[in-house]
Amino acid sequence: MKISIINFSLIFKNKIIIIALITWILNQAIKLFIFYITEKKWDMMRFFGAGGMPSTHSALSMCVVVTIGFAEGWDSSLFALALAISFIVMADAAGVRRETGEQAKVLNKIILEFFKERKIRDKNFEELIGHTPFEVIVGAFIGIIMACILYGNLNF
């Protein structure tokens, strides 16, 4: 198969990718507003950052799962694969990545306490990496809802 710019441009006509992109943008915007409500300050980097409420990883993965279900069928192998990968992504967000964030908090405290006189790092370890199970569930619901709303309403 010959790859060309014309074939590559079809990516921008892929309904699943467009819906996933819209879901990502919306979810990150929600995350930004929730951060403002809870912290009483704007931090535009939260729009691009990982971690926090709701989980964009969960929203994006479940959005893709549902749009694949609509497009390919709920009994398709592609749907089953997407669902399995989505569960892995969500388990990782609430498990390994969350633990990494908790460990980063401890390391930052240790470095601050024991190395007051001597700077050993230019910046702290990122602490807001993973998600609570609730953040993962909320993100998953947002992804499902967005897929259901957008799949039937985007026509191209």
Cite the ranges covered by each PLM segment:
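Membrane-embedded catalytic cores of phosphoryl/pyrophosphoryl-handling enzymes
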Residues: 25, 42-156
